[in-house]
């Protein structure tokens, strides 16, 4: 039984590390606490409750989590501190001993933050922790964040059964699981009722959707496409072996699914892909990109790449660079390999020095910018429909075209959360966006 009177006049602050899924889950936690009467603290206000949603994909992410705990404890003396997320799952007992931490919640308890706030009495002798082994977790914690009420993030799947050699996510998130399509359609309908226009479909391995319910990712896409009021959907990230021709073909003819794919490659040589235990080779990946381009020539295609994994010699990196350079893609998300305890990758010979990882990373980041700018340049002078978002104070108003080109224009309150037809001009000062040369009118 929750005593809601304890939360009267209380304020909370939230700190999130990691992926879009984590941000979605934090927003859901925040929403639940607000419904219980806990206000989100404004900038500079002292909070009574601190919620940290952690990440464990790299050593740096874990370090940032510990730094965030120390900073929030220092800035909010006496606040009740809760840590959840992937790092909390993997190192619950360790985190419970961090100065100021009251409760650490593993993945199975992530949806129960409110229940674990108790009477907000701090623990003087160290924090409590609740985390069962990820392999035993079967529950699915729903999440649909509304953010700025323009773009929603809908969690459709959790966990992963792939066990790539470099990755701790299966140990932090558990086995692949999902709710029924009908439940997710209901959440999309709620987002539409609140005025949402765009939904980003998120998860850990969303193409694996359906294992828990006997459904499929394609059936989910088809059902969501029929939700009235949602003008746009984006597929956040999908494994190359799970993005079937049927999915690509459906998106190509879809009412609301945008020509935008994010497909993780992770390594550009067959030798390293094999060391990683990925489920495809470079030939398969290239064919998949070509198929997307054939059916959706204007699609924005983002690709994840990890540099400096064990076993990636300089020769293999050069081979990977040339392969990636030849792909007709729009942008790269580049990550430096981080050694994670308990992973099979630690058994592989050929560790890459940090300086060499950095060099390789910078080469691919530069290649990514070349590809993104070249993609943007194709659309200068053309008309496009942009969904504009609420601007930050003093900043231009920004939004995205259907194929994920960032567009900026002077602030105009009437255009916020509206689909607006514009004529695309040249680049802004730092080339991060195109300027809307002309506002043609609303496209809805």
Positions of the model-derived regions?
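Proteins enriched for Cys/Gly/acidic motifs involved in redox and nucleic-acid/cofactor modification
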Residues: 1-208, 222, 246, 261, ...
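Alpha-helix N-cap/loop-to-helix initiation residues
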Residues: 22, 58-61, 88, 240, ...
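Conserved SAM/AdoMet-binding glycine-rich loop
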Residues: 81-82, 90-91, 95, 193-315
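Short flexible coil/turn linkers enriched for glycine and charged/polar residues
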Residues: 147-150, 160-161, 257, 267, ...
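Hydrophobic, well-ordered secondary-structure elements that form the walls
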Residues: 263, 304, 324, 332, ...
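Contiguous mid-protein beta-loop-alpha structural module that forms a pocket-lining wall or clamp
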Residues: 312, 327-329
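Short glycine-rich, low-complexity segments
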Residues: 330, 343-347
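Terminal RNA-binding accessory module
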Residues: 347-444
